[in-house]
């Protein structure tokens, strides 16, 4: 190896880095502890008919000419200039006689080796000797030390030397040392605590929130990918002309096209972009790092590109001329500490070399990598054409996403560079055409015709064809089709006698049983609309629903004691009396487009809202499912869902329309897997339809108690909440050929709107996907600006088609807010978040607002907060849902110290829950009540919900009542069982099983141990009586007699 002494002298041996260089190097160090990533710029150029000696001599001249190439980048964040340095002979790979495929492989291997190298050398050079007297020059620069214009200058000077022209002398006052000291001295004058500096930082939006598939720190290696867009000289000049016409620079025009594309893939109107600006006016001809990054809040969407680009020009100029210098290293550190949205700030960058360059040679290949940059766009002029270089760390992003973004950028660039383009026109859609095509095809699948029947009509047709077939089984009771129809007609007659007319609303308020089904069929036969109102909620709330729905008649069960009227506004009719009335001879004529039922869901203002569903909307869903899964007369469903939960609509009308059988459990057995297994095995149930948590409970119980019940189920349909990734395989452990169906939708869209048949569950799945729209239903994934989101981009799920509700009963404002009519199509804004996969599959990503699902129930946290704030002495309350998939409710309360009584005892968690039980259904009462002095706040002064979530993990004991010790033998017995199941923990009378760490699996184990000890406990009892004190009382009541215990 030849070694030549570097000839230049440098005034100092140690030079501090600038803020920008510190940031680049520190980010690189963070990501290179165990990974392979460095900051570099790499270029390849071909040189024809030039000898290797000539090329080596010219390169050596340039390296000797620039002091920076003699430096070493050390671990102490300094550049060191040794007194004696050496230039190594350049590596050579002779491929002059190689075959083309071997040359291609060798060049690819060279690129891979060079780009993955962790070398900190300032410059690395290699030759590849190719056929036809061509030398491929490979040059890698350390970009912490050498910026983009310096790379350009390097190759310009090489061209200059090869043409025989000497290099100009360097000005001894224009040095890297002078520049670094100048920049660092300016930084010393910046007050990082000043209001102006902080004002700038706090007003910056987050970087584009692009979809990712992994965190960069977890990458073992990083492959940088370069993609290029070339704009012809003619189109480039047209773009420049139009830009100048509108008083914007071409650079801002290109950056604004970039921000428009980033806005669509990031689902945000405003985003932070890093401009890498090189200020070299006083340092012309020097190679070094002169970049001063500028963070600019850019607009990504306006009504027209003209307004967008003008806005961005203004924002850029304001940032560039800001009266307080904003150093990038300090900016990034500040932003990273503000919120999670700034976890990776300034990771997308724009830079350009449009003013001073026109490369005579075009690079054969190149790329640019930086540890703190995920995606960069660099604009240069090569041979009079605009070349836009996209460099991306593709491993961070979903496959082909950057390629799709590039295509959308190209389309918009091409449009804006047309000769007579009008930039004031509305921006076109940038959704890639192939994505739009896939979605249109999926949204039009299926040949199901819109039904012209009523929801109950097929049941009554089946009565004629199979009158003696079993319609309902409930324990030891059963009804055949003709008897059920007779009861329904008599019920309709009784309703008519009570003054019910076609279109009236009639409430059904009774516990689960045959009466519920008789009631809804009777109401529909009478031409009325059924309104299920659960008994499991305070009377005050029930009556508010009755009044809001304009209900006069309420069908009840004669044995339900909760249905005692508080006034004479309502007429209560028990179904047992109703079926003794004179039957209605023929059904009331109603149009299929008219309402069939109204289901009331939680409302954010504290008032429940009534979802109005038509006959044809609900029946369309039932028919689609029945046809898809060939539901018929031999099928039986275990109907677990409450009547006010719309899964019950399919349980009733899906099965009765197909000639099948409904198998019921009692109200107390709705959470009892013992009863479910018995019913499944005894009555040969073939179908399961519930929220995932209940099916999980069934499988868990079956495993613990060796039940074969799951093997009876040929079809399992789960919806209403997250579906565990383990459930499909656990089900198929019982039935290999079983069909496992994931479904989703909204009450406002007729039960379900999408379906997915789950076969295998790939390891990379985050959750079971939503799948595809049902026939005559459509989906869109829409961002906050009303644009269709590209693949992988999270947006709000909109449902369209024939299942859309008629609106919210007697609430035009809420209806207009959630139901939209666009270009002749009706859409319901679900408030759910989702995204498309490239094949058109929909993935559910959770809620976007304060609505949550707990145990399958849709709950508005705002309604809970209204109820909490109604409690005397409460200054402010916040409700949250805790947990990822299996959520529970928690409430945080700050008491009003001025209004709260001083003498009386303070409000405790148990009292709060008792007061809430008077206003809300039991499933809406938070399990955890935590009292605070003040609420934690974000940097923007809003309640910090993430901090509250963290508190729930530390404050489990505060959510329970005053810790009274365990006294009775029964309580001690319960505590021993709980400790055996949950592990040793301190328990009190008020200790709650589920707040003490119990889950569904643990609950089943407790029931199992109770049985062994001689207590015939049902699982539902533990859910209903979940404290030590309450469960001990129930256990005593369930003690078996000695001979029964012996038999057990």
Curated annotation (Swiss-Prot):
<dbReference type="InterPro" id="IPR025110">
    <property type="entry name" value="AMP-bd_C"/>
</dbReference>
<dbReference type="GO" id="GO:0006826">
    <property type="term" value="P:iron ion transport"/>
</dbReference>
<keyword id="KW-0408">Iron</keyword>
<feature type="domain" description="Carrier">
    <location>
        <begin position="965"/>
        <end position="1039"/>
    </location>
</feature>
<dbReference type="GO" id="GO:0005737">
    <property type="term" value="C:cytoplasm"/>
</dbReference>
<keyword id="KW-0804">Transcription</keyword>
<dbReference type="Pfam" id="PF13193">
    <property type="entry name" value="AMP-binding_C"/>
</dbReference>
<comment type="pathway">
    <text>Siderophore biosynthesis; anguibactin biosynthesis.</text>
</comment>
<keyword id="KW-0805">Transcription regulation</keyword>
<comment type="similarity">
    <text>Belongs to the ATP-dependent AMP-binding enzyme family.</text>
</comment>
<keyword id="KW-0813">Transport</keyword>
<dbReference type="GO" id="GO:0043041">
    <property type="term" value="P:amino acid activation for nonribosomal peptide biosynthetic process"/>
</dbReference>
<dbReference type="InterPro" id="IPR042099">
    <property type="entry name" value="ANL_N_sf"/>
</dbReference>
<dbReference type="GO" id="GO:0003677">
    <property type="term" value="F:DNA binding"/>
</dbReference>
<dbReference type="InterPro" id="IPR009081">
    <property type="entry name" value="PP-bd_ACP"/>
</dbReference>
<dbReference type="GO" id="GO:0031177">
    <property type="term" value="F:phosphopantetheine binding"/>
</dbReference>
<protein>
    <recommendedName>
        <fullName>Anguibactin system regulator</fullName>
    </recommendedName>
</protein>
<dbReference type="InterPro" id="IPR001242">
    <property type="entry name" value="Condensatn"/>
</dbReference>
<dbReference type="InterPro" id="IPR045851">
    <property type="entry name" value="AMP-bd_C_sf"/>
</dbReference>
<keyword id="KW-0238">DNA-binding</keyword>
<dbReference type="Pfam" id="PF00501">
    <property type="entry name" value="AMP-binding"/>
</dbReference>
<comment type="function">
    <text>Bifunctional protein that plays an essential role in virulence. Plays a role in both the production of the siderophore anguibactin and the regulation of iron transport genes.</text>
</comment>
<keyword id="KW-0614">Plasmid</keyword>
<dbReference type="InterPro" id="IPR020845">
    <property type="entry name" value="AMP-binding_CS"/>
</dbReference>
<dbReference type="InterPro" id="IPR023213">
    <property type="entry name" value="CAT-like_dom_sf"/>
</dbReference>
<dbReference type="InterPro" id="IPR000873">
    <property type="entry name" value="AMP-dep_synth/lig_dom"/>
</dbReference>
<dbReference type="GO" id="GO:0044550">
    <property type="term" value="P:secondary metabolite biosynthetic process"/>
</dbReference>
<keyword id="KW-0410">Iron transport</keyword>
<dbReference type="Pfam" id="PF00668">
    <property type="entry name" value="Condensation"/>
</dbReference>
<keyword id="KW-0010">Activator</keyword>
<dbReference type="GO" id="GO:0016874">
    <property type="term" value="F:ligase activity"/>
</dbReference>
<dbReference type="InterPro" id="IPR036736">
    <property type="entry name" value="ACP-like_sf"/>
</dbReference>
<keyword id="KW-0436">Ligase</keyword>
<dbReference type="InterPro" id="IPR010071">
    <property type="entry name" value="AA_adenyl_dom"/>
</dbReference>
<dbReference type="Pfam" id="PF00550">
    <property type="entry name" value="PP-binding"/>
</dbReference>
<keyword id="KW-0406">Ion transport</keyword>
